[in-house]
């Protein structure tokens, strides 16, 4: 299908969000929070082009917003009129999610049906840099491409693209803020992010394995479940761990079993499974420290941002998108960043490997000097005070509105 569909008479002030909204993925959380700000702002009515049916409301506060989004989503399905492939050209502007596909001919997507707006904008978060003519041509199709971190924007600007802007993502300050710490007998090392080579969980396991031998009260608490397939070959490529990991009958990775196989005592590892975003604050409340040893971040690592906003002392790899989160005293940076020892550097030559010993030293520093750790955690929370979804999304709304008015 290529056209305007059956009817677009009631689409005044609509602004399409061309990806799946929800709480299960970073993109989903991003979209829901952007939509909430847009609803409050009232210049645009956000429209979710949902692929997987209705969005589910996790909290009573979100129920009204989700109901409106689902209602508009149903209306977009009427515009499609049952077609399963093709392109619907909308009479309203659309924001598109862009990832590593921005580097490939034709901007390939994982679905047969797509939407195009009267004006098109992109939010671009890529981890692999295959910069080429396709990157330029794809990005040039959009009125504005909002990069998810300064590193992403620098890559696009280096290609000579004049239409880039920055959209650093936000946090929900009504959920993620410092709370009084619970009394507990364990030193809880939290590590989050879907399990994959890029996120550096193998580095965390290697470091905690050493740390745990010195501190029997330490426990590694993980939120590492990955709903997508994992390359076990990649997990073990750096030599820190055996990458082979089993899944249970529900398709969930057996994180605890994998950690034990890689040398962590059973009493010092707990995997919390798939935790809804609205409940992550309970996890951060129990954390003594949070560790993020990513080899690359195309955005600014939403889980790290939430942990910082909650006042948790954070250890961050000093590379790519993480650099946007760092000041002199708001976290514990891992500065020893080495090129990857891999035979397949294409697209990942900018990725960096954190040093296991430096990570162990950072954990020891937090363990032995809680005063410094608490001060850095407090500074991190203050820093994230400027990163609310409202403060981050309003400039994007302004830029989009101005671009539309300039047409």
Question: Could you say what each language-model-derived stretch is?
Answer:
Residues 277, 282-287:
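Short alpha-helical donor nucleotide-sugar binding micro-motif in glycosyltransferases
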Residues 16, 60-155:
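Extended catalytic core of nucleotide-activated donor transferases of GT-like folds
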Residues 285-299, 312:
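Acidic donor-binding loop of glycosyltransferase active sites
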């Amino acid at each position: 299908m290529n056209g305007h569909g059956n009817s677009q008479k009631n689409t005044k002030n609509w602004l399409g969000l061309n990806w799946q909204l929800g709480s299960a993925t970073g993109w989903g959380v991003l979209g829901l929070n952007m939509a909430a700000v847009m609803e409050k702002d009232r210049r645009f009515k956000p429209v979710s082009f949902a692929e997987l049916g209705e969005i589910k409301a996790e909290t009573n506060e979100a129920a009204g917003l989700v109901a409106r989004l689902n209602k508009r989503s149903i209306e977009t399905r009427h515009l499609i009129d049952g077609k399963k492939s093709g392109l619907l050209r909308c009479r309203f502007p659309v924001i598109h999610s862009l990832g590593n596909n921005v580097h490939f001919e034709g901007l390939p997507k994982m679905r047969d049906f797509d939407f195009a707006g009267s004006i098109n904008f992109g939010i671009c978060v890529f981890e692999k840099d295959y910069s080429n003519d396709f990157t330029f041509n794809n990005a040039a199709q959009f009125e504005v491409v909002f990069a998810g971190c300064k590193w992403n924007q620098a890559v696009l600007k280096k290609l000579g693209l004049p239409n880039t802007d920055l959209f650093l993502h936000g946090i929900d300050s009504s959920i993620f803020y410092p709370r009084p710490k619970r009394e507990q007998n364990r030193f809880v090392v939290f590590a989050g992010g879907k399990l994959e080579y890029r996120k550096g969980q193998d580095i965390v396991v290697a470091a905690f394995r050493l740390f745990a031998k010195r501190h029997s009260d330490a426990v590694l608490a993980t939120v590492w479940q990955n709903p997508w397939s994992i390359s076990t070959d990649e997990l073990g490529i750096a030599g820190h761990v055996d990458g082979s990991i089993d899944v249970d009958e529900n398709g969930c990775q057996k994180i605890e079993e994998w950690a034990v196989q890689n040398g962590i005592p059973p009493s010092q590892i707990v995997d919390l499974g798939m935790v809804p975003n609205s409940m992550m604050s309970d996890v951060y409340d129990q954390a003594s420290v949070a560790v993020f040893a990513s080899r690359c971040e195309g955005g600014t690592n939403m889980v790290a941002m939430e942990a910082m906003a909650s006042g948790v002392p954070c250890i961050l790899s000093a590379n790519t998108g993480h650099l946007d989160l760092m000041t002199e005293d708001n976290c514990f940076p891992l500065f020893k960043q080495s090129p990857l020892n891999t035979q397949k550097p294409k697209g990942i030559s900018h990725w960096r490997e954190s040093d296991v010993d430096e990570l162990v030293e950072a954990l020891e520093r937090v363990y032995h000097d809680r005063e410094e750790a608490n001060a850095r955690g407090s500074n991190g929370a203050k820093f994230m005070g400027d990163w609310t979804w409202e403060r981050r999304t309003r400039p994007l709304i302004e830029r989009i509105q101005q671009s539309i008015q300039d047409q």
